[in-house]
Structure formats: C-alpha cells, structure tokens
Amino acid sequence: MAAAVRAAGFLPALCGASAGRLWSRQLYLNTFPTASIWALKAVPSNGPSSSAGARGRCRSTHLGPALQTQCCTPAPGNVTAQQYRSYSFFTKLTADELWKGALAETGAGARKGRGKRTKRKRRKDLNRGQIIGEGRRGFLWPGLNAPLMKSGAIQTITQRSKEEQEKVEADMVQQREEWDRKRKMKVKRERGWSGNSWGGISLGPPDPGPNGETYDDFDTRILEVRNVFNMTAKEGRKRSVRVLVAVGNGRGAAGFAIGKATERADAFRKAKNRAVHYLHYIERYEDHTIYHDISLTFKRTHIKMKKQPRGYGLRCHRAITTICRLIGIKDMYAKVSGSVNMLSLTRGLFQGLSRQETHQQLADKKSLHVVEFREECGPLPIVVASPQGALRKDPEPEDEVPDIKLDWDDVKAVQGMKRSVWSGLKRAAT
C-alpha cells in the first residue's frame, strides 16, 4: 500500500523556513518508518526571512508518528530528507545466522554430533502472527490490515480506540501461547518393525511431478536409515544420512532408491521422490503369489522364495514382507541366509522377482502344456497355459529339466523327521 501523505504541520517550525509553500514531492509512508531518524536540510529562500546562518541541519525523532496522520499543511519549498537507520551487529546478520549462534548450531561440535544429550533450545519464528500494518498505535491501513473497499467506497485511514487495541494485543498474546503449547505436543508416529527404528515406517506417497502428475496410489516405506561419514580436508569428519526406501502401489509396480543428505528429512524426501523414477513391474500369479519357486544369490546374500497357496500369508524376512506388500504379493515363503545387508537383500529380491517366467512364456518356450498339480485335486493335472504355436510331440529332454537342489530341512519336514530340539527334553525333578 502506498498511501501518499503530505508533510506534517510542524515541519516549518522545525526547519526554520517560511510557511506558505507546499512540498514538491509526496512522502510515502512505506519510506518513513516510525523508528527512523530524519535529518532535514533547510535551503534558504530568497525571502527576507532567510539568512546564511539559517542553513543547518535539524533532526527529529518524533517525525514518524506525526506523519501517520493524514494532513496537508504548508511546508518549505526546498527540503531534502535523508534517512538514518541504526547500524549495529544485529543488522549485519540474517535471522537464520542469529538463531544458529543462539542455539549453538555452528562449529565443529555440532558437525561432530556433540552436545546431543543436553536440553536444547527450540527455534521460534518471530514473524509468525505478525500482520503488515499492525502497530502499537492501532492505525487501520486500507489494503493492509483493513479492507480497501467497504460498501462500495474506499476507506480512509482510521485508528482503533484504546480498548480495542488492548483487546487485539491480548488476543495475539493468547494465540502465540496456544501455538507454543501445540508445538510441545508430540504426535505418536506409526510403529514400524520395532519401537526404536525407522524400518517399516510409511512416508506417504511421493511428491507430485513437475508436469502435475500425482502418485496418490503409491506408498513409501523406509527400509534402512544409516549415518555415514566422509573425511574431508576442509570440514574433517563430515556426517550425512543415507536412507533406503521402497515404493509401490500394491498392483505390481514397485521400486527402491537411496537418498543422501545432511538432514534426515531431506534424505527422506530425496529417496522418496527418486524411487518413483526406478519402478519395476513384477508379474503375479492370480494377483497373490509368484509364478514359481526362485532361488538366487546376490553377492553374499542367498534368498530362496517359494510359491504358496491362498491364505498362507507372508512368512519372510521383515524387509521382504514390507516390499511384498508394496508389490501386491500376499502369499509367499522366503528364507534368507548369508549376509543380511539391506541393500544387497533389496537388490537381490527385485532382481529375482523381475526375472521370473510366467506360465505362458514357459509354454511358448517349451512348446508344451504347462500343468499344475494341487493337493485338493489329487493326481489330476490342471492346465494353466498352452503354447500359441504348434505343440511339440516329444517330451521335454532330461537335459533341459532344471536341477533343483533340495534343502535338507525341507526333506526332513516332508518325511516327518524334522522335530524340535526341545521335544525329548525332560525337566529335572525339583
């Protein structure tokens, strides 16, 4: 708002100049802060009342409040205004730099993680609740803290009464106290795999893309949060946060990515938005399980997955269970042996699931019918896929039959030899 106000009535008296002339320029309120000090240089006119000794400089600290009244009074003809602002250490720094100094967020101690157990002060937003145009004197400026138009007419600058101004200030103090009280309340986050880890916690859908695309049907789950360090020549041991997340829509589309940043929240955001750009489509048999058993080795991690009927559920490693739910797999058994590095486990799982072969692909490859034997159907085979081309007459050669290595625990379970180590234990008499 640029409300033009002409000079105050006592300007001629302050400057010692003759009245009867108006200022040639208009003074705008946004260029006259109340706390500023103005030095007015009075240039003598050609009249008899002027003299060479009258040239001087007069300063007024109460000129700002006088200019807040809308008036039009005569003023000297040649008056130049120069603005003086108080200059100190606090005007050189920004609010963020001042807060960092007050909260001890800078220095080697903060970078190396020292002082974490002390009672830390909280940063306050001092601009919160402030309205442009509001002041202690209670002036109502149309377009700032008051509507510009009222009943079809432009409002003029008015002032609240003393009682109304006290009520407005009391309401503002009460509102700030409520904000501080709400900030201290802790909201219980969703429980993940355990109470003291970030694994399994949902981050919500990824952020919308630059072209307006949204991912509301996707969900993001945290798999791992680690603090990593890099030794630099300038800052020494520099700490950063590495986050591994997985995203999926529950209908076969899923992906994973890593986000790195100095702050944990920034790492979450980076990983979540990056994972949606590296999606895999996983084929599912009847939208509930995998097409066939999968056994794979990724680096030092060994994963063995088995197809299961409906109602079996997910009996897997907790990270595999989280990823399968994001994919849409509901029934599967998986066993992890060797290294349980989270990144190797995730990469190996996506590699094995994305390379599985559907029944139709297997039928076209072998030129044979693909049949399935179910326990409820007995020896009756169920045809699940047929080749699209000509059917081969001769059976599959023995060399092409995959050599599946059986797990000894599975063999003992089938033959009834697998028993608990505590089955024959007898408690001593007391």
From Swiss-Prot:
The record ties this protein, via InterPro entries, to:
Ribosomal_Su5_D2-typ_SF, Ribosomal_uS5, Ribosomal_uS5_C, Ribosomal_uS5_N, Ribosomal_uS5_N_CS, Ribosomal_uS5m_N, Ribsml_uS5_D2-typ_fold_subgr
Chief location: mitochondrion
Recorded source organism is Bos taurus (Bovine)
Q: Name one GO biological process term.
A: mitochondrial translation
Location within or outside the cell: Mitochondrion
Boundaries of every S5 DRBM domain copy = 218-282
Q: Could you give the subunit structure recorded for this chain?
A: Component of the mitochondrial ribosome small subunit (28S) which comprises a 12S rRNA and about 30 distinct proteins.
Q: Where are the transmembrane segments?
A: none
The record, for Pfam families, names: Ribosomal_S5 (PF00333), Ribosomal_S5_C (PF03719), Ribosomal_uS5m_N (PF21251)
Name this protein carries in UniProt: Small ribosomal subunit protein uS5m
* UniProt keyword terms in alphabetical order: Mitochondrion, Ribonucleoprotein, Ribosomal protein
Stretches with biased composition (Basic residues): 111-125
Q: Please give the residue ranges the record annotates as the region Disordered.
A: 108-128
Q: Which family does it belong to?
A: Belongs to the universal ribosomal protein uS5 family.
Domain of life, per UniProt, equals Eukaryota
One example of the protein's molecular function in GO is: RNA binding
Q: What is a single cellular component term in the Gene Ontology annotation?
A: mitochondrial small ribosomal subunit
